[in-house]
Regions:
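A subset of solvent-exposed loop/turn segments in beta-rich extracellular surface proteins, enriched
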Residues: 1-11, 40-66, 111, 115-119, ...
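Exposed, low-structure sequence patches enriched in small/polar residues
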Residues: 15, 69-73, 78-104, 111-415
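Short coil/turn connectors at secondary-structure junctions
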Residues: 29-30, 159
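Long C-terminal interaction/binding lobes of large macromolecular proteins
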Residues: 1-4, 17, 21, 33-35, ...
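Hydrophobic, small-residue-rich alpha-helical packing segments that form membrane-like cores
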Residues: 18, 26, 32, 36-89, ...
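Hydrophobic or amphipathic alpha-helical targeting/insertion segments
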Residues: 9, 14-17, 22-25
Length: 415
């Protein structure tokens, strides 16, 4: 909606369209767009019905290969946008359907999720600027349910901002490819208020604080009743020089969760505290980054668990067209709930932030070679060594040993 029609530049093999699209300026300030897509999607077919959609794009085994191009999806739609001065208003409509009925096996918490053959969404979006205020929002309807998202941004002074966001996504709203602001990745079954502020009262300092109050009108995974939660964050950034910066980030989250072994009859609040310190130093062609994370998790009336990690990364861009990046991580957590995340540089157009639990080391190295303006070659190698287990994974992914290695290569050709 905000950026209009654009190419698909990610390695994601699911969230994209394949077809034709065009935008025409009907009159000054008025644009009309149309698009059509027809593509095959991986999945599982049982009794001439689609029972699940396979989104990874991996076809390593016979079972995974059987899911290739299991059904087709056709999609068509359009958008009309008017923009003049400080006002922007648009309307978008989309209609899509499968060649088979989509009937997934849904548990109680997911009983209102998308199912059927034919779907549609219609939405209206707006943006208005007035002095230091910016108001944006969207309202949409689907085959069932509706969703609302409104945001008010106030630039108080230079370096001072205030943001208020409200969202309401009904429990039965269906929008297959939609992504929106919220606690969940999909705009469904959520209501909440988000308040954030940013301030730079001192030279080289920047402070950020946010508070998110959310609720789920229907059940969620491992929450067998309507529930609510709180997510708060505070961050302090200090940057005394152009090539030197550091920040401290604290995050608190409270949610509800079923107690294991009670079949959802007992639900208690859980509390999570995350603390991160990061130092970045970038002299000339070198960049050094140090990250320390701490995570504490506990459920009411139960003993808590904790985890921490230490990560050091180093990257260097040589005068000739080679860039090298290495990173090492040591992690130690009590269980999965106290897991930690460590982001890594990866292939182009990918975002890689793996989680770790248990005890061990992670090492990765990435080399990029720009042959010329046309060819670019990139290779990445990583290895994780666990100190608390003798086997990794299960089934076809079982590794007999405590070491797990991965190798990725990419060749880009610009025409």
């Amino acid at each position: 909606r905000n950026s209009g029609i654009r190419k698909h530049s990610s390695t994601d093999e699911y969230n994209y369209f394949r077809g034709a699209a065009a935008t025409v300026e009907v009159i000054p300030a008025l644009q009309l767009s149309g698009f059509y897509s027809h593509r095959s999607i991986d999945g599982v077919i049982e009794g001439n019905e689609i029972t699940s959609i396979y989104k990874t794009g991996l076809h390593r085994t016979e079972k995974e290969a059987d899911k290739v191009n299991a059904f087709t999806l056709q999609l068509m739609g359009g958008n009309i946008t008017y923009e003049k001065n400080n006002l922007k208003v648009g309307m978008t409509g989309i209609y899509y359907f499968f060649n088979r009925s989509y009937q997934p096996v849904l548990r109680t918490y997911a009983k209102y999720n998308l199912q059927g053959n034919y779907f549609h969404n219609v939405g209206v979006d707006y943006k208005y600027r007035w002095n230091r205020f910016t108001l944006t929002g969207e309202a949409a309807m689907g085959k069932q349910g509706y969703s609302l998202l409104n945001q008010l941004k106030y630039n108080i002074l230079t370096g001072y901002q205030l943001l208020i966001v409200h969202r309401y996504y009904s429990h039965n709203y269906w929008a297959m490819f939609a992504r929106s602001f919220g606690e969940s990745s999909a705009p469904q079954n959520e209501n909440g208020w988000y308040l954030a502020t940013e301030a730079s009262p001192l030279a080289h300092w920047k402070f950020f604080a946010s508070l998110d109050l959310f609720s789920f009108p229907w059940w969620k995974y491992r929450i067998s009743k309507p529930s609510q939660g709180v997510d708060g964050m505070f961050q302090s950034l200090y940057s005394p020089k152009r090539n030197l910066s550091m920040y401290v980030n604290y995050r608190y989250k409270r949610k509800e969760r079923d107690v294991a072994g009670t079949d959802g009859k007992v639900i208690l609040p859980t509390y999570q505290h995350r603390l991160r310190y990061r130092l970045t130093y970038s002299p000339d062609h070198l960049q050094l980054r140090t990250t320390v994370d701490y995570n504490h998790f506990h459920s009411q009336g139960q003993e808590g668990s904790q985890g921490y990690q230490f990560t050091q990364s180093c990257s260097y861009a040589f005068s000739f067209p080679i860039k090298i990046s290495v990173q090492g991580t040591y992690f130690h957590t009590d269980d999965y709930d106290s897991r930690i995340y460590a982001s890594e540089k990866g292939l182009l157009y990918t975002f890689y932030t793996p989680s770790f639990y248990g005890q061990g080391f992670r090492f990765s190295a990435c080399v990029r070679y720009d042959v010329n303006k046309v060819f670019m070659f990139l290779v990445k190698f990583g290895q994780t060594i666990y100190e608390d287990r003798e086997n990794i994974g299960s089934g076809n992914d079982l590794i007999q040993g405590n070491k797990k290695a991965d190798l990725q290569m990419q060749l880009r050709i610009k025409i």
